[in-house]
Amino acid sequence: MMRDFVVVGLSHRTAPVEIREHLAVAPDRLEQELREIAANGRLDEALLISTCNRVELYVTSANPIAASQIAKDALAKRLPEAADDDVLYQERGIDVVRHIFRVASSLDSLVIGEPQILGQVKEAFDAAKGAGTMGTLLGRCFTQSFATAKRVRNETGIAEGTVSVSSIACELAKKIFGNLEGRRTLLIGAGEMGEAAARSLQQTGTNLHVINRSEERARALAESCAGRAVPYERLTTELADADVVIVSTASPKFILTPELMKSVVRSRRRRPLFIIDIAVPRDVDPRVANMDNVFVYDVDDLQQVAEENLAVRAREAALAERIIEEELDAFSAWRRSLELA
């Protein structure tokens, strides 16, 4: 019996960040998570993608109906009690291949044309290989998704002047103030997202302060972006002095809590503080948004800014969709050759 593809997942299109963060898996946990999912031996292959805007489990099996239920159960058990499992979507067969081609090419991203997703898909691919859950079908499917994404970038203008979640966060900060020049921006986190935000902020003339648990990483990033590194112990002082805060760490727990922010709010003397949280799981406790003169935005609040970018890319996205259908035909031909063999 021929094996077939199944994907079960959720994304920014089906679930808000307060649900997505419950399913998020840190990059260094992907392999272990896959081993646990595949432990019952009922799935032939498995691959897990986890980003700030999506969590998707790809599997193959000779019994796709049973595989769908296994994959759904693996994700649904981590949903919060208040969430309905209809936030999870499912695809089977060739629709799964089309879906991952679109995901890798950033056509299903919050920000169409953003460059980070391809690296995240490759990271998931490597984790599946490391976990021993990658086989012929997923291997070919994902390898071809990388080639498809490369064609889309090379043959369309979808990435011209491209923006990312991080740069949209900076765009939002500029919209709030009109101009960031001379304003103090505190960046908490010096990982990939933080680095992308720092690069965008560098062009605004803001007074950039970078804080990270690893002071060495904070210093390296600050020096490369004409900013200033600050010891983590000065977090509350920096929060008291900042005009805008962009936070993106890999912490599994909230970084900014009401308890921490209480003294910050008091010392600011009614001066408003704008916090943009681009981490998933979130770095800012939702209760912070209820505090006086504190305004919190999360990744879902970036949607409106992203949609302004979408109209510009609509024509290029149509060209990209044609490339995906061509690559899908090529993949289908490869599958048929396996059946004949």
Identify the residue ranges that each predicted region occupies.
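A glycine-rich (often HGG/GG-containing) alpha/beta subdomain
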Residues: M1-S109
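Adenosine-phosphate binding glycine-rich loop
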Residues: E21-L30, K262-A341
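Short active-site oxyanion
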Residues: E45, T206-H209, R271-F274
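Internal alpha-helical scaffold of NAD(P)-dependent oxidoreductase catalytic cores
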Residues: I65, K72-D85, G132-T133, G139-T148, ...
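Glycine/serine-rich phosphate-binding loop and adjoining beta1-alpha1 elements at the start
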Residues: A83-E181
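Glycine-rich phosphate/diphosphate-binding loop of Rossmann-like nucleotide-binding domains
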Residues: C170, K174-V244
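Rossmann-fold NAD(P) dinucleotide-binding segment
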Residues: E195, E238-D243, P252-I275
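Short glycine-/small-residue-rich Rossmann-like dinucleotide-binding loops
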Residues: T249-S251, A279-V280
